[in-house]
Amino acid sequence: SRWFESKRAKDPHFQAKAALVAEQCRMVGLAAGCPWAFENPVSVFSSIFGSADYTFHPYQFTGLCTDDNYTKQTCLWTGNGFKAPAENMHPMVEAAIDAVKLACGRMMPKKKAIEAISGTSFAGLVTDWYPDNRIHECPPSDERANIRSATPLGFAKAVFLSNAPHLNKKREAA
């Protein structure tokens, strides 16, 4: 990460401390016998814990919360039967992404996507529904770390529903 050197200058042990918190999460999950996961953005955690079991972007769960329409690849390490949720993307988000991929061959930052689609029938769709980069563009502030570390609500709901089969059975019975 581009911030590692400044973090390391402030605290040479910052990465070890983060790994310790992740290991504590893993141990509590194992001791409790429940599904568990810890997350971290793409980082050096893979050199400590191995490759992530699952990765996602918040926009992939906009079917459960449209406020999460942004990019931020996040890695999960999981255990004890954790079930990764199925993607649940809002149809308009999916259509906007498809339009950009059709025109450009791949996803790209929203500003570039809007420029590339400008003047086409998809311009409004992409402007309104294409995932933004708010996390990466978040200016330095006292709240930046909290904004970047907040769990996306749509993903949190999807994880809960995937890992609470007893509640799904109650819902089906109702």
Predicted stretch roles:
Residues S1-A174:
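Conserved active-site and SAM-binding loop architecture
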